[in-house]
Curated annotation (Swiss-Prot):
Residues 24-33 have a biased composition (Basic residues). PANTHER family: CYTOPLASMIC POLYADENYLATED HOMEOBOX-LIKE PROTEIN, HOMEOBOX PROTEIN ENGRAILED. GO terms for biological process: regulation of transcription by RNA polymerase II. It holds the Pfam family Homeodomain. Residues 28-87 bind DNA. This is Cytoplasmic polyadenylated homeobox-like protein. The gene is CPHXL. It is found in: Nucleus. The keyword DNA-binding applies.
Length: 405
């Protein structure tokens, strides 16, 4: 720099740089669009009606005022920015909730705007509560209405709070009205039967065929899904199929298609019970009541085909096996004081003897006869409670020692 404060360059170059800077500044600036008083008044009226106009409205205003659409957008944006904070907040909330049209009250004071916003929030909360109540009322109404069998599926339980008639339930096991049977236990048994692929008719018959006592009364009603007739036992809309059931049920049968079971009857107390084929020492019913063991005399099976005769299903029993006499002869050879845990040894020896006695079919033994023999052996073996046989053996050991002494 010189002593006079001027730069040491040429003045022509400095003027050239200044001109370039001025031209750049001019290029960046935009001319502000000015509306007339009439147009401004019209824009203010539109802004008072809706401060967030849609694209169609803005496009119409741009054509009418002979200006680009972005000019209309900028004017509305600047107009909204000049509103009070409370009013802007209220308009923003309404715009987010898509509650159109939104009216801007620019002439209101801040206190009035806050009061209006508070009232709006209160109304919104009340309307939300009313919607929730309406939804709940709708759900309760749907729950109370009658439900057809197609929509309910195969639910055997949880029908206490629904006004569903037994005729409309169809093949489902509804209202097992036995004294003292919790519906949850009956439902769990029925659902277990259905998970294993048992038809609904068998499920209904299984759930209705409940054993203990001798008093008989109608069991689970099954509605026929086809042409509903009248004049049969039950109502006029559907036919109720009544199976033999008993006064107080303590157990439900396992599914007949998966596992066979043994059926025995005591003539002294007129009580009948079912023992599982897993050779349990004692059976436990639905109430948790322990049932003492019994000698099983014959095998009852529900695997027979269900025939429809006069609108009713009848359970058929299988005939006794052909090798019944051979089984009785083999049974006499087995010791009578053996427990359930000795069945494996008995069965291995019995199987070897039976294979030598039974006729051969194409070089293979008759498996069906062996199966019936296994059932006969299990039926003739006494079922002792847990630990009873061990206690008897432990008590017999000191007796034998005393006799030897």
């Amino acid at each position: 720099m010189n002593l006079d404060g001027t730069s040491g360059g040429f003045p022509a170059e400095e003027d050239h740089h200044n001109e370039e800077r001025q031209t750049k500044n001019k290029r960046k600036t935009k001319h502000r669009h000015k509306f007339s008083e009439e147009l401004l008044q019209e824009l203010k009226e539109i802004f008072g009606e809706n401060c967030y106009p849609d694209y169609t409205t803005r496009k119409t205003l741009a054509i009418k005022f002979d200006c680009p659409v972005n000019v209309i957008d900028n004017w509305f944006q600047n107009k909204r920015a000049r509103l009070p904070p409370a009013e802007r907040r209220r308009i923003f909330v309404l715009q987010k909730k898509h509650d159109f049209p939104v009216q801007a009250h620019s002439f209101l004071s801040c206190q009035e705007t806050q009061a209006a916003a508070h009232n709006y929030a209160t109304k919104q909360s009340l309307s939300g509560a009313q919607r929730a109540l309406m939804r709940r009322a709708g759900c309760s109404h749907l729950e109370k209405q009658w439900i057809p069998s197609q929509e309910m599926g195969y639910n055997c339980f949880s029908l206490e709070n629904q006004e569903t008639p037994s005729q409309q339930v169809g093949p489902q096991c509804s209202y097992l009205e036995k004294p003292g049977i919790p519906s949850q236990q009956v439902g769990s048994q029925c659902s277990y039967l259905e998970k294993l692929g048992i038809p609904s008719q068998q499920v209904a018959s299984q759930s209705s065929y409940l054993v203990t006592g001798t008093e008989k009364h109608p069991g689970c009603a099954m509605g026929y899904g086809g042409d509903t007739g009248s004049g049969h036992s039950g109502s006029g809309h559907s036919t109720a199929y009544h199976f033999l059931s008993y006064n107080s049920a303590e157990c439900l049968h396992p599914p007949p298609s998966s596992v066979p079971y043994f059926h025995g009857e005591r003539t002294e107390t007129k009580e009948s019970q079912h023992a599982s084929p897993f050779l349990l020492d004692y059976a436990q019913g639905a109430y948790g009541v322990k049932k003492d063991h019994c000698l099983c005399s014959f095998c009852l099976s529900l695997l027979g085909q269900q025939q429809q005769n006069d609108w009713q299903y009848h359970l058929q029993q299988h005939q006794q096996p052909q090798n019944y006499l051979e089984g009785m002869m083999l049974q006499e050879q087995l010791p009578m004081d053996s427990g359930p845990w000795d069945l494996g040894k008995q069965w291995s020896s019995a199987q070897s003897q039976l294979q030598s006695q039974l006729p051969q079919n194409n070089g293979k033994p008759l498996c069906s006869q062996l199966q019936h023999m296994s059932l006969q052996i299990a039926a003739d073996s006494p079922l002792l409670p847990l630990g009873q046989d061990m206690q008897e053996r432990a008590s017999e050991q000191p007796r034998t020692q005393m006799q030897q002494l």
